Amino acid sequence: MMTIDNRVADVFSRRMAIQSVAALLLGSTVGVAQAQLPMSTAFNRAARNRILSQRLAKTYCQLLLGVLPEFSAKTLADVRQQVRTGFDELAKTSMPPDLASRVADLKKLADAADALLVFPPTREAVSAVAQQAEKVMAASQSTAEAFEKIAKVGSAKLINLAGRQRAVSQRIALDYFLIAAKLDGKGLQEQMKADMAEVRKGLETLAAAPVSTPAIRNELELGRAQWLFFEAAMQRAPDGKGMETVATTSERLAEVLDKLTDLYDGALKEVLG
């Protein structure tokens, strides 16, 4: 059995190793560091484009279908602003060349998606936005994985995992609305089933993870409960009431999982000191 002294030594050793990585990533100049995001938060900001891309396409499709027009328009405007703010914050972060290049490429894809949103939500426009959103999500996923490899700490993996669940849940909702708009292409139903299974497994993995706090456990329970509401909503026919229910439950799920991901970000910052 590990003694208290051994545990303290182990924690201290781990903290020193993580801080060494943090120092390498964040830079040694105090003035620069103060102007930059913590690397864990930069990781979260870049990875957040997974969920933001799907929410953009989802709410744009909701506008096409006439689902809660005022709510959908406000959500779309808010998400577009979050994308811009996120990249503005990332521009303040010093990072290795490979990561900087990935973030720059990701921004180009996100800008292209945003440019499409100036057009009215026709079927053709919604289809184009959905396709571009998938490109943004793929690029954001690879960027998140690159951040995780550099960080080499368990909390980074959890930020990535929690962040992916929030994104995949929104892709499920987007697919529901694409089907309602009769824009469901080949393989969409299979993707929805796979995504549903991925979120269930992801939430189970997070629940079993050793990195936890009371706040994380509470938010995770809220997330799992909200997921059940969302699953039930997804069983409804895509009529007026059904689409409204999916729109509201998916946004509530996004809110909870976004907060959960931010809590993992906070836990990593505490470890980094």
Residue ranges of each PLM-predicted region?
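N-terminal secretory signal peptides
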Residues: 1-12, 20-30
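Sec/Tat signal peptide C-region and signal peptidase I cleavage site
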Residues: 31-35
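Mature extracytoplasmic or organellar-lumen-exposed domains after removal of signal/transit peptides
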Residues: 36-273
